[in-house]
């Protein structure tokens, strides 16, 4: 019975030690999370780091500012500048995450165009060639179109327009790559679906001429003559000097056929009202 007090004393000492250790950890953690420097100083320090090219350090400093002083005037801009600093540091996932956070928390604000520009730029830089996965291209295009539609007067709108053309051309090239593969494998329906995407979604790219010609080839192979004739008619009307029109016209002529537009064709509808054409050959 005399041993009980000793055991109680030992247990009490252990409890005090554990509590002290936990208290010390909490204190250390709180110090790491919350910076007691005023937000103006933290912002100036982060800005100085960025100006000296220390982008990774600057990004973390901006994040520290947002975490320590979330309701300060500097905190909101710190989020988008953290995204920019991460982008300059080559840390794409972190840049996108910070910029997306800004667009969710502060849509329509002064720096929203910059946030979308950062996201678009990060994905645009990660675009792959036409024979590879186009996820980054599609995400870049989505953000670029947001810039064009929501912020047409922003400093990033003109750059967005140029990049949209490049991204759409890349996507069209990818569809053509896959479509030609299916055509070579004589899977004409699958090939048409790929070429159709180019015709309906990427009419302003350099690939649409070949897409129309290959649509004609595939429909001829399937015996769907009226669609082939429509494809050649639309091709000839819009690109009369194209080598692809010459090839498509020769294909019809070899079968005793000529270009003829069908108003019920998806091709006509895709190009809206296509004027009636002369049924002569290319000049």
Give the role of each language-model region:
Residues 11-21:
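Bacterial N-terminal signal peptides
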